[in-house]
Protein backbone atom coordinates (compact mmCIF):
# COMPACT_ATOMS: atom_id res chain seq x y z
CA UNK A 1 0.00 0.00 0.00
CA UNK A 2 2.80 2.42 0.91
CA UNK A 3 6.60 2.41 0.99
CA UNK A 4 6.90 5.21 3.56
CA UNK A 5 5.65 5.39 7.14
CA UNK A 6 5.54 8.13 9.76
CA UNK A 7 5.66 7.01 13.38
CA UNK A 8 3.72 9.36 15.65
CA UNK A 9 5.25 9.21 19.12
CA UNK A 10 2.65 9.48 21.85
CA UNK A 11 3.44 11.74 24.77
CA UNK A 12 5.43 9.78 27.33
CA UNK A 13 6.47 6.99 24.94
CA UNK A 14 9.86 5.60 26.09
CA UNK A 15 12.74 6.19 23.65
CA UNK A 16 13.55 2.47 23.58
CA UNK A 17 10.09 1.69 22.22
CA UNK A 18 10.32 4.44 19.62
CA UNK A 19 13.64 3.08 18.38
CA UNK A 20 12.45 -0.54 18.33
CA UNK A 21 9.41 0.34 16.24
CA UNK A 22 11.47 2.44 13.83
CA UNK A 23 14.09 -0.31 13.47
CA UNK A 24 11.33 -2.82 12.72
CA UNK A 25 9.91 -0.59 10.00
CA UNK A 26 13.33 -0.10 8.43
CA UNK A 27 14.85 -3.58 8.83
CA UNK A 28 11.82 -5.83 8.53
CA UNK A 29 9.29 -3.87 6.49
CA UNK A 30 11.88 -2.04 4.34
CA UNK A 31 9.96 1.22 4.31
CA UNK A 32 11.23 4.78 4.41
CA UNK A 33 10.61 5.90 7.97
CA UNK A 34 9.94 9.25 9.61
CA UNK A 35 9.49 9.84 13.34
CA UNK A 36 7.08 12.56 14.40
CA UNK A 37 8.51 14.53 17.31
CA UNK A 38 6.83 16.56 20.03
CA UNK A 39 7.53 20.25 20.76
CA UNK A 40 8.45 19.22 24.30
CA UNK A 41 11.95 18.45 22.95
CA UNK A 42 12.63 22.18 23.26
CA UNK A 43 12.29 22.25 27.03
CA UNK A 44 9.78 24.02 29.23
CA UNK A 45 11.65 27.31 29.69
CA UNK A 46 12.11 27.93 25.96
CA UNK A 47 8.50 27.04 25.11
CA UNK A 48 7.10 29.25 27.87
CA UNK A 49 9.32 32.22 27.02
CA UNK A 50 8.63 31.97 23.29
CA UNK A 51 4.86 31.78 23.63
CA UNK A 52 4.80 34.57 26.23
CA UNK A 53 6.81 36.78 23.88
CA UNK A 54 4.21 36.37 21.14
CA UNK A 55 1.23 37.14 23.34
CA UNK A 56 0.24 33.56 24.16
CA UNK A 57 0.80 33.96 27.88
CA UNK A 58 -2.84 32.95 28.45
CA UNK A 59 -2.03 29.42 27.27
CA UNK A 60 -1.38 27.38 30.40
CA UNK A 61 0.86 24.32 30.82
CA UNK A 62 3.29 22.97 33.37
CA UNK A 63 6.50 21.03 32.87
CA UNK A 64 5.32 17.45 33.36
CA UNK A 65 5.10 16.61 29.64
CA UNK A 66 8.55 18.11 29.13
CA UNK A 67 9.92 15.80 31.83
CA UNK A 68 8.08 12.67 30.67
CA UNK A 69 8.46 12.98 26.89
CA UNK A 70 11.48 12.11 24.74
CA UNK A 71 14.52 14.14 25.81
CA UNK A 72 17.00 15.82 23.48
CA UNK A 73 19.95 13.85 24.91
CA UNK A 74 18.12 10.59 24.12
CA UNK A 75 16.63 11.67 20.81
CA UNK A 76 19.75 12.84 18.98
CA UNK A 77 21.87 9.67 19.40
CA UNK A 78 18.83 7.56 18.50
CA UNK A 79 18.21 9.54 15.33
CA UNK A 80 21.87 9.20 14.32
CA UNK A 81 21.64 5.42 14.79
CA UNK A 82 18.44 5.19 12.78
CA UNK A 83 19.81 7.34 9.99
CA UNK A 84 22.88 5.10 9.76
CA UNK A 85 20.63 2.02 9.72
CA UNK A 86 18.46 3.46 6.95
CA UNK A 87 21.57 4.31 4.92
CA UNK A 88 22.75 0.69 5.18
CA UNK A 89 19.32 -0.54 4.07
CA UNK A 90 19.16 1.90 1.15
CA UNK A 91 16.19 3.71 2.69
CA UNK A 92 15.45 7.21 3.87
CA UNK A 93 15.04 8.19 7.50
CA UNK A 94 13.79 11.56 8.68
CA UNK A 95 11.71 13.48 11.17
CA UNK A 96 8.28 15.01 10.97
CA UNK A 97 8.10 18.23 12.96
CA UNK A 98 6.03 18.52 14.93
CA UNK A 99 3.19 16.97 16.83
CA UNK A 100 0.59 19.12 18.56
CA UNK A 101 1.39 20.61 21.96
CA UNK A 102 -0.61 19.57 25.07
CA UNK A 103 -1.88 22.49 27.15
CA UNK A 104 -4.27 22.81 30.08
CA UNK A 105 -8.01 23.43 29.83
CA UNK A 106 -8.57 26.47 32.04
CA UNK A 107 -11.67 28.17 30.67
CA UNK A 108 -13.97 25.22 29.99
CA UNK A 109 -13.00 25.04 26.32
CA UNK A 110 -13.39 21.24 26.33
CA UNK A 111 -14.79 18.68 28.80
CA UNK A 112 -11.29 17.45 29.66
CA UNK A 113 -8.17 18.46 31.54
CA UNK A 114 -6.01 18.94 28.45
CA UNK A 115 -6.34 20.05 24.86
CA UNK A 116 -3.84 20.24 22.00
CA UNK A 117 -2.41 23.45 20.61
CA UNK A 118 -1.91 23.69 16.86
CA UNK A 119 -1.75 26.39 14.20
CA UNK A 120 0.32 29.55 14.07
CA UNK A 121 1.27 29.52 17.75
CA UNK A 122 3.12 26.26 17.03
CA UNK A 123 5.17 27.74 14.17
CA UNK A 124 7.96 29.39 16.23
CA UNK A 125 8.38 26.22 18.28
CA UNK A 126 8.42 23.83 15.33
CA UNK A 127 10.77 25.93 13.19
CA UNK A 128 13.17 26.10 16.15
CA UNK A 129 13.10 22.30 16.36
CA UNK A 130 13.78 22.14 12.63
CA UNK A 131 16.72 24.54 12.95
CA UNK A 132 18.22 22.56 15.83
CA UNK A 133 17.90 19.24 14.02
CA UNK A 134 19.19 20.67 10.75
CA UNK A 135 22.28 22.01 12.51
CA UNK A 136 22.87 18.77 14.45
CA UNK A 137 22.79 16.70 11.25
CA UNK A 138 24.50 19.20 8.96
CA UNK A 139 21.36 19.54 6.87
CA UNK A 140 21.51 15.89 5.78
CA UNK A 141 18.48 14.68 7.73
CA UNK A 142 15.16 14.73 5.88
CA UNK A 143 12.60 16.95 7.60
CA UNK A 144 8.86 16.85 6.97
CA UNK A 145 6.83 19.74 8.37
CA UNK A 146 3.56 20.17 10.24
CA UNK A 147 3.21 23.02 12.70
CA UNK A 148 1.49 26.22 11.65
CA UNK A 149 2.26 26.04 7.94
CA UNK A 150 0.06 28.33 5.82
CA UNK A 151 0.13 30.60 2.77
CA UNK A 152 2.37 33.07 4.59
CA UNK A 153 5.23 30.67 5.19
CA UNK A 154 4.86 27.54 3.04
CA UNK A 155 7.19 28.94 0.36
CA UNK A 156 9.83 29.77 2.98
CA UNK A 157 9.71 26.27 4.43
CA UNK A 158 9.94 24.69 0.98
CA UNK A 159 12.87 26.92 0.03
CA UNK A 160 14.72 25.69 3.12
CA UNK A 161 14.54 22.15 1.76
CA UNK A 162 11.83 21.11 4.22
CA UNK A 163 9.09 18.99 2.64
CA UNK A 164 6.57 17.31 2.52
CA UNK A 165 4.56 20.03 4.26
CA UNK A 166 1.17 19.16 5.74
CA UNK A 167 -1.41 21.48 7.26
CA UNK A 168 -4.85 21.37 8.82
CA UNK A 169 -5.54 24.38 11.04
CA UNK A 170 -5.45 26.92 8.22
CA UNK A 171 -8.17 24.94 6.38
CA UNK A 172 -10.46 25.24 9.41
CA UNK A 173 -10.56 29.02 8.99
CA UNK A 174 -12.78 31.05 6.62
CA UNK A 175 -12.10 29.98 3.05
CA UNK A 176 -11.56 26.36 3.99
CA UNK A 177 -10.06 24.19 1.27
CA UNK A 178 -10.03 27.14 -1.13
CA UNK A 179 -7.01 28.35 0.81
CA UNK A 180 -5.06 25.65 -1.03
CA UNK A 181 -5.32 27.74 -4.19
CA UNK A 182 -3.23 30.48 -2.62
CA UNK A 183 -0.86 27.92 -1.12
CA UNK A 184 -0.53 26.14 -4.47
CA UNK A 185 0.26 29.40 -6.25
CA UNK A 186 3.08 30.05 -3.79
CA UNK A 187 4.59 26.62 -4.40
CA UNK A 188 4.08 26.69 -8.17
CA UNK A 189 6.39 29.68 -8.35
CA UNK A 190 9.25 27.62 -6.90
CA UNK A 191 11.45 25.06 -8.63
CA UNK A 192 11.19 21.50 -7.35
CA UNK A 193 14.42 19.57 -7.04
CA UNK A 194 15.18 16.18 -5.50
CA UNK A 195 16.22 16.45 -1.86
CA UNK A 196 19.75 17.81 -1.60
CA UNK A 197 19.71 18.77 2.05
CA UNK A 198 18.15 21.28 4.42
CA UNK A 199 19.58 24.80 4.22
CA UNK A 200 20.74 25.18 7.82
CA UNK A 201 21.36 28.92 7.62
CA UNK A 202 17.96 29.58 6.02
CA UNK A 203 15.97 27.54 8.53
CA UNK A 204 17.83 29.12 11.45
CA UNK A 205 16.92 32.55 10.08
CA UNK A 206 13.29 31.47 9.61
CA UNK A 207 13.10 30.22 13.20
CA UNK A 208 14.65 33.39 14.58
CA UNK A 209 12.28 35.61 12.59
CA UNK A 210 9.26 33.59 13.76
CA UNK A 211 9.85 34.66 17.36
CA UNK A 212 8.94 38.25 16.50
CA UNK A 213 6.79 37.79 13.37
CA UNK A 214 3.84 40.19 13.52
CA UNK A 215 1.61 37.69 11.69
CA UNK A 216 2.13 35.20 14.53
CA UNK A 217 1.48 37.55 17.43
CA UNK A 218 -1.74 36.91 19.33
CA UNK A 219 -4.01 39.94 19.49
CA UNK A 220 -6.48 39.77 22.35
CA UNK A 221 -10.13 40.17 21.45
CA UNK A 222 -11.99 43.08 23.08
CA UNK A 223 -13.81 42.07 26.24
CA UNK A 224 -17.38 41.18 25.38
CA UNK A 225 -20.18 43.29 26.83
CA UNK A 226 -17.66 45.87 28.00
CA UNK A 227 -19.16 49.24 28.80
CA UNK A 228 -17.98 52.06 26.61
CA UNK A 229 -17.60 55.54 28.04
CA UNK A 230 -18.46 58.40 25.74
Language model features with spans:
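Active-site beta->alpha loop and helix N-cap motifs at the rims of alpha/beta catalytic domains
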Residues: 1-16
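Structural preference for beta-strand elements that scaffold enzyme active sites
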Residues: 4-7, 32-36, 90-96, 140-144, ...
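Extended, H/D-rich, highly charged conserved domains that either
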Residues: 15-21, 25, 34-38, 42-47, ...
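A cross-domain feature marking catalytic cores of carbohydrate-active enzymes
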Residues: 37-39, 97-99, 147, 169
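Glycine-rich phosphate-binding active-site loops on the catalytic face of alpha/beta enzymes
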Residues: 39, 158-182
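Glycine/Thr-rich beta-alpha phosphate-binding loop at enzyme active sites
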Residues: 43-139, 174-192
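Glycine-rich beta-to-alpha transition loops that act as phosphate-gripper elements at the mouths
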Residues: 99-101, 141-154
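Single conserved hydrophobic/aromatic residue that forms the stacking wall/gate
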Residues: 217-230
Amino acid sequence: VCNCATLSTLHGCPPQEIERIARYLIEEKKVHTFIKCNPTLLGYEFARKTLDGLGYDYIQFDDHHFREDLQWEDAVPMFHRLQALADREGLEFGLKLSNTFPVDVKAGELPSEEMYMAGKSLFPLTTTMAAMMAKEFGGKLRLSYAGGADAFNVDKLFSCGIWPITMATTELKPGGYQRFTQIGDKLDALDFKPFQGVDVTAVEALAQAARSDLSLIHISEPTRHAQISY
